[in-house]
């Protein structure tokens, strides 16, 4: 359980959507992060994969602000302390807003995957996962923005999928977090994307899986990685 509480973009700090505080405030600060109604700090499971809640978390609404990022620039997402039992992949997507991200219809966003990390080492099941590397990096994850994509406004969809109960159908726990970015530069690629409600199904091999057995490999969920 957890959420992104701070974001560092090209060395500049931006506050996250503090779901443990902001829903209870009459006038919460405007941020680049999307708001959610997940005040339990919880997740979306397979029963929500074909609903809008999987896109940017439960009841998500666009952040009012947008942060500039240079092509090849870095976005560091700083989480609340992540439970070490919650092993799983960390996946990052971008979707063009085709306009202002603060007013975008999330159900129309088409995401392409820009980074993925899954099972690192399975010598001693459940093994070492991307989530463990996130914990080791002081509960943070850094994603690099591709240099090849066309400039414009994008939603970054950053996600941990916790697999500690994934041996049961709908046992995997998705924690998507979205932020608004304005990518600058001279790229020209407009990669094909996938609607958020089509990213996952609850029987995908990387979603319905027992991580407490020896795994020869792990198939990271979602569409193929964009490599530029």
Swiss-Prot record:
GO function terms (MF aspect): cellulase activity; metal ion binding; monooxygenase activity
Subcellular location: Secreted
EC number(s) reported in the record: 1.14.99.56
GO annotation, biological process: cellulose catabolic process
Disulfide-linked positions: 56-178, 97-101
InterPro entries in the record: AA9 (IPR049892), AA9_LPMO (IPR005103)
GO CC term (a single one): extracellular region
Residues with the Methylhistidine modification: 1
Binding sites annotated in the UniProt record for Cu(2+): 1, 86, 175
Binding site for O2: 164, 173
Job description of the protein: Lytic polysaccharide monooxygenase (LPMO) that depolymerizes crystalline and amorphous polysaccharides via the oxidation of scissile alpha- or beta-(1-4)-glycosidic bonds, yielding C1 and C4 oxidation product. Catalysis by LPMOs requires the reduction of the active-site copper from Cu(II) to Cu(I) by a reducing agent and H(2)O(2) or O(2) as a cosubstrate. Is able to cleave cellulose and xylan to produce C1- and C4-oxidized products.
Entry protein name: AA9 family lytic polysaccharide monooxygenase A
């Amino acid at each position: 359980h957890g959420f992104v509480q701070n974001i560092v973009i090209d060395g500049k700090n931006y506050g996250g959507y503090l779901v443990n505080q902001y829903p209870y405030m009459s006038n919460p600060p405007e941020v680049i992060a999307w708001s959610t109604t997940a005040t339990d700090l919880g997740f979306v499971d397979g029963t929500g994969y074909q609903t809008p809640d999987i896109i940017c978390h439960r009841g998500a609404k666009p952040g009012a602000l947008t942060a500039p990022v240079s092509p090849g620039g870095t976005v560091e997402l700083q989480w609340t302390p992540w439970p070490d039992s919650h092993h799983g992949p960390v996946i990052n997507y971008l979707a063009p807003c085709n306009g202002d991200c603060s007013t975008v219809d999330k159900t129309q966003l088409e995401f392409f995957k820009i980074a993925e990390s899954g099972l690192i080492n399975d010598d001693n099941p459940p093994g070492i996962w991307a989530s463990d590397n996130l914990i080791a990096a002081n509960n943070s994850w850094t994603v690099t923005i591709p240099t090849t994509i066309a400039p414009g406004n994008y939603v970054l969809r950053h996600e941990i999928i916790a697999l500690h109960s994934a041996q049961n159908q709908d046992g995997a726990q998705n924690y998507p977090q979205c932020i608004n970015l304005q990518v600058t530069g001279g790229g020209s690629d407009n990669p094909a994307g996938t609607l958020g409600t089509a990213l996952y199904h609850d029987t995908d091999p990387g979603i319905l899986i027992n991580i407490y057995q020896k795994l020869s490999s792990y198939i990271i969920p979602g569409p193929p990685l964009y490599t530029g």
